[in-house]
Amino acid sequence: MKRGWIPIMGVCLVLSFSACKQLLPYQDASLTAEQRAEDLLPRLTLEEKVSIMQNASPAIPRLGIKEYEWWNEALHGVGRAGLATVFPQSIGMGASFNDSLLYEVFNATSDEARVKSRIFGESGVLKRYQGLTFWTPNVNIFRDPRWGRGQETYGEDPYLTGQMGMAVVRGLQGPEDAGYDKLHACAKHFAVHSGPEWNRHSFDAENIDPRDLWETYLPAFKDLVQKAHVKEVMCAYN
């Protein structure tokens, strides 16, 4: 009689282990990113939500979430992550007035980025400059040549900046009907962040003329969000 119970117990153990391995909705790769996020967010405590609101997001072991470093750069090619194809600075690419060319540049950049991230990910943890979230493009308006980061922009023209910025986003993120994003682009810095750099943490931009704000500084961000569907937006420091 005792021997007869052994196979039954074995089957029960297999079934129980299978139940334990059943994926929760946020772990199910067959669901959309939106569905998985909607399932995951209510499972996070307030403290856990706060902890991941920074570029160095810690792991949440109880939910099987690994630590993640959001900071990565691709201003004119994959940056700070070993060998990569280096393209001209943004101000130079902007001078081409060729948004189709810019799309191809950042389509190639996102290809390299995915390969690099895949290799880096073999270690188990993606460190800074190894993930798939890139803080590019910079769609601020370059009005003052004394601003030390003007070379990151596409110049002083709001329309050109919007066109170039959208090409960058589409090249980095890939086709919207692909079912997944190649990576995430980030529109920065929202908004009126065009210098001075030395006092950026205290500079008061509230004295800007409302017409100048809406006609000069905001159109590119509107283009990237509403037309190119950029996945991230970085706030300004002012």
What are these regions (language model features)?
Residues 1-24:
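Bacterial Sec-dependent N-terminal signal peptides
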Residues 20-238:
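Glycoside hydrolase catalytic-domain context in secreted enzymes
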